[in-house]
Amino acid sequence: MAQPKITINNLNFYYGSNRALKDVNLEIQAHAVTALIGPSGCGKSTFLRTLNRLNDLIDGVRISGEILLDGQNIYAPEVDVVALRKRVGMVFQRPNPFPMSIYDNIAYGPRIHGITSRRELDGIVERSLKAAALWDEVAGRLRHSALGLSGGQQQRLCIARLLAVEPEVVLMDEPSSALDPISTLKIEELIHNLKEKYTIVIVTHNMQQAARVSDYTAFFLNGEMVEYDETEIIFTKPRDKRTEDYITGRFG
């Protein structure tokens, strides 16, 4: 197996005195989709947010262990968190377009990072919208408000906005749970296409979705990572009975 993109060693995470993650060890492979599954409150979203330090924004949290991105500990004191979040971006559960035009949503990140050339920005906007399978639907109305898009289009816009800053890793926290079935299918097709260029980690409550879109699956329960393997093995021949019980609907 190739060198992992992200390596997690003995990760523990605390909200105050509450230990939300317990000795998590995991290797996330590059150019693959890794799904995180488990019942509500199991720690999967907390774990996802440790991967680009979004939990830093919460008072009273602390962490032990290490998370290595291409061999570098992202919690080392010298790490630039803004630069980290450019490399490891997040797509949230509900679409959150900025109250500005479609064009300006996509150009927002590149402008922050110093790109001012109109020609360069035009190219980034077009490439990003094409990568997010949205260009054909919005090419004629780039100056219109992004808030006028449908929910599914808004979520693909948010993915395009993330791709515009050229991340290496894309984190997705239930990216289609607020969408209708047709929009969900488009997001799943997009995830499949994006893994050629990006490493993707997705939290989902939808077991069928995890089985459809992911190459690897990690099952979390009560803050522990119970089992991690290729998705086909997790869903057909899990080693741990707790995994089998969850997947077959005996609890969750």
Swiss-Prot record:
Keywords, comma-separated and alphabetical: ATP-binding, Cell membrane, Membrane, Nucleotide-binding, Phosphate transport, Translocase, Transport
EC number of this enzyme: 7.3.2.1
Entry's Gene Ontology BP terms: phosphate ion transmembrane transport
Record domain ABC transporter: where: 6-247
Subcellular location: Cell membrane
Annotated positions binding ATP: G38, P39, S40, G41, C42, G43, K44, S45
Catalytic reaction equation(s): phosphate(out) + ATP + H2O = ADP + 2 phosphate(in) + H(+)
Cystine bridges: none
Superkingdom to which the source organism belongs: Bacteria
Gene Ontology terms: cellular component: plasma membrane
SUPFAM superfamilies hit by this protein: P-loop containing nucleoside triphosphate hydrolases
CDD domains cross-referenced by the UniProt entry: ABC_PstB_phosphate_transporter
Pfam families on file: ABC_tran
Gene3D superfamilies in the record: P-loop containing nucleotide triphosphate hydrolases
Matches recorded under PROSITE patterns: ABC_TRANSPORTER_1, ABC_TRANSPORTER_2, PSTB
GO molecular function: ATP binding; ATP hydrolysis activity; ATPase-coupled phosphate ion transmembrane transporter activity
Membrane topology qualifier: Peripheral membrane protein
Function: Part of the ABC transporter complex PstSACB involved in phosphate import. Responsible for energy coupling to the transport system.
Family of this protein: Belongs to the ABC transporter superfamily. Phosphate importer (TC 3.A.1.7) family.
PANTHER family (alphabetical): ABC TRANSPORTER I FAMILY MEMBER 17
Subunit architecture: The complex is composed of two ATP-binding proteins (PstB), two transmembrane proteins (PstC and PstA) and a solute-binding protein (PstS).
Stated name of the protein: Phosphate import ATP-binding protein PstB
